[in-house]
């Protein structure tokens, strides 16, 4: 597969402070982005949702829907290259299946389209060990991740069972909410991307985040990672810092029941190496930063007349996010922030936690078995290494998460 190109190379540090972001006003349907691949993604999602709006929703999905795809090749020398490349290809995998999944996750196609096409997605400084790069939609509701062709194949392998599982649990799960999978081709560069619901809030800033696997071998953030404004910390960091998750017994019971069910499903599919992503919002800290930002904004008043605060750009219809009633500090809409849990009343700090399973597309194949054998030789048979078999992995994962809650 060709290198991901600029989609991940122009990465900016994400700010933990709740600064009001500004962007230059952009008319609807321009799809202007700094990266031509992002422009093509915006164009493609817009095209796809428009096409699907004319297709009748079937009573049930058919086996062929899980193999289907739609693709389009555009050769148009009249395009303004400042907005769009003149030659590109866009492919969407299993469009009917992902439309059905969006519906089951309570996501309206029009809202999905607006979030991904109104303004360019924002780069995110998170980077997976695999080299995958991330963007978030401008309104922070969705995450766009580059994936490999092997990931696409694995997604096809599990999609039917994943869909059935989502049907059975009525969309109530800690698993990634897969919402669309696409291939983009521009100037000989080919990349694959998958869109999921953001684990974190579009409104409540996260000041600390952890990627937890239940393993202790080589599970500490590097010095380079820790130097970031919002580093992704790991299991040993969580333990060594004495970090705690303060949720009440009822929320803990509900969370662990969902987690157990989800992880058993992953083990059945022989999937492993997934993580629990944990984000922590500090309510008082966020309030203080909001006050500081408002004071700074007051000083900068009138300096940038050509920009508009984040939200609905001009010349476009209202967004459901911005039309909802204002929420108090630390409050959230559970229909949007589906992974959010409040701390209990006696917690030392008022916090909101965002917790969900991520990175589920690693199958326990020969490659992982070889890695496990090599790590066992290096660290010893009893070491808590991450490449154990799926049943061992799921048990250790559940034990660790149950222990830290």
From Swiss-Prot:
Q: Which residue range or ranges hold the PIPK domain?
A: 33-405
Q: Which residues carry this modification: N-acetylalanine?
A: 2
From its record, what is one biological process in GO terms? Answer: vesicle-mediated cholesterol transport
The enzyme's E.C. designation: 2.7.1.149
Give a brief account of the tissues where this protein occurs: Detected in rod photoreceptor cells.
**Region entry Disordered, spans:** 288-328
Enzyme type, top EC level: transferase
Residues where Phosphothreonine occurs?
3
Q: How is it modified after translation?
A: Phosphorylated in tyrosines. Phosphorylation is induced by light and increases kinase activity.
Where does the UniProt entry say this protein principally localizes? membrane
Specify residue ranges for compositional bias: Acidic residues.
289-304
The answer to keyword Kinase applying to this record is yes
> What GO MF terms are annotated?
1-phosphatidylinositol-4-phosphate 5-kinase activity; 1-phosphatidylinositol-5-phosphate 4-kinase activity; ATP binding; protein homodimerization activity
Residues found modified as N6-acetyllysine: 89, 145
Keywords noted in UniProt: Acetylation, ATP-binding, Cell membrane, Cell projection, Cytoplasm, Kinase, Lipid metabolism, Lysosome, Membrane, Nucleotide-binding, Nucleus, Phosphoprotein, Transferase
How does this polypeptide assemble, per the annotation?
Homodimer. Interacts with PIP4K2B; the interaction may regulate localization to the nucleus. Probably interacts with PIP5K1A; the interaction inhibits PIP5K1A kinase activity.
In its UniProt entry, what is this protein called?
A: Phosphatidylinositol 5-phosphate 4-kinase type-2 alpha
> Which organism encodes this protein?
Mus musculus
Q: What is the lineage of its organism?
A: Eukaryota, Metazoa, Chordata, Craniata, Vertebrata
